[in-house]
Design a protein with these regions (language model features):
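S-adenosyl-L-methionine-dependent methyltransferase catalytic core, i.e., the SAM/SAH-binding region
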Residues: 1-310
Length: 310
């Protein structure tokens, strides 16, 4: 595959369709990455439109800054995490915005750089931090957490059925030598996994440790809990997820905003007086076309959900 294609943002047409209602408004790309989605959004904004791009990875910020140079008067790039969006916007004296986008997938400069430690396909340090400012690495988790906690991580963040066996083997191996490389971790997983199931098990375990290292699900939930108050009426929320744990959080959150009633089903009418705050724009999850998957294989597991503030 052409290297440039690895930086191609996913579901671009769908993002634009659901996100931009007011081209003169203020939009947030909470997962700036290399600036792919932001570039497409900025191309469609009017002169009064603005975009705030947020990322906590210095490499991503530098790549995005270069890519978005032509729009420097309309884009503001901030280092931070979307979980802190309220504070980030408040620092810019912004109360509400017209649209927020999150693309929760890994960028190629995470996956393809062995030194970042995100992939089992090459040997590198067990890092997995999205931000170098974070103190705890994947090696710290695998070397210090208890066997029961490791099993919990593999099961709950990776949905891995062999969670206990893998955790037990991690602990056994680290008693001999501290786990510091992806090769060590990969060999441990392989040692307790049938050959035919190794790829999926490796993917699940690496996902689990990455989520634990970066607090990804906690950050997503924190963002969701504040997102409603940051959106103007008729503003849009668009989220692209890449695994079932993220998608489940988003789906359940949107369902609660669309139908917040807590009354017992046997009551003939609502008495709790809780009103919907959002309207679903995607009744079914939006996935990439066959053509897009052919061009960008990493788009194949992407799922988009969108809603409008009411």
């Amino acid at each position: 595959m052409n290297k440039d294609l690895l930086h191609t943002p996913v579901l671009v047409d769908q993002v634009i369709k659901y996100l931009i209602v007011n081209p003169s408004g203020i939009f947030v790309d909470g997962t700036l990455g290399g600036g792919g989605h932001s570039f497409e959004i900025l191309k469609r904004l009017k002169l009064g439109g603005r975009l705030i791009g947020i990322d906590w990875d210095d490499v991503a910020i530098e790549k995005a800054r270069q890519r978005l140079q032509a729009f420097k008067n309309q884009v503001l790039i901030k280092k931070g995490n979307f979980a802190n969006l309220t504070e980030i916007l408040a620092a810019e004296k912004i109360d509400k915005v017209d649209g927020i986008l999150l693309d929760l997938g890994l960028s190629s400069f995470h996956i393809d750089v062995p030194e970042r430690g995100f992939s089992y396909l090459s040997d590198g340090p067990l890092d997995m931090r999205m931000s170098k400012d974070s103190k705890r690495t994947a090696a710290d988790i695998l070397s210090n957490e208890s066997e029961s906690q490791l099993a919990w991580i593999f099961y709950n963040y990776g949905e891995e059925r062999r969670s206990r066996a893998i955790a037990r083997t991690v602990v056994k191996n680290r008693q001999q030598k501290r786990l510091e490389t992806t090769k060590q971790f990969t060999e441990i997983i392989k040692s307790v996994t049938p050959y035919s199931q190794r790829i999926k098990t490796l993917s699940r375990c690496y996902q689990a440790v990455r989520i634990a290292t970066n607090g990804e699900l906690d950050n997503l939930q924190t963002f969701l809990d504040q997102s409603i108050d940051l959106l103007h009426f008729s503003a849009r929320l668009v989220i692209i997820s890449f695994h079932s744990l993220e998608d489940r959080l988003v789906k359940n959150f949107l369902a609660k905003q669309v139908n917040p009633c807590e009354c017992p089903p046997e009551l003939p009418y609502c008495v709790c007086n809780k009103k919907p705050t959002m309207k679903l724009l995607t009744r079914k999850v939006v996935t990439p076309s066959i053509e897009e998957i052919k061009l960008n294989k990493r788009s194949r597991s992407s799922k988009l959900r969108a809603a409008e503030r009411i």
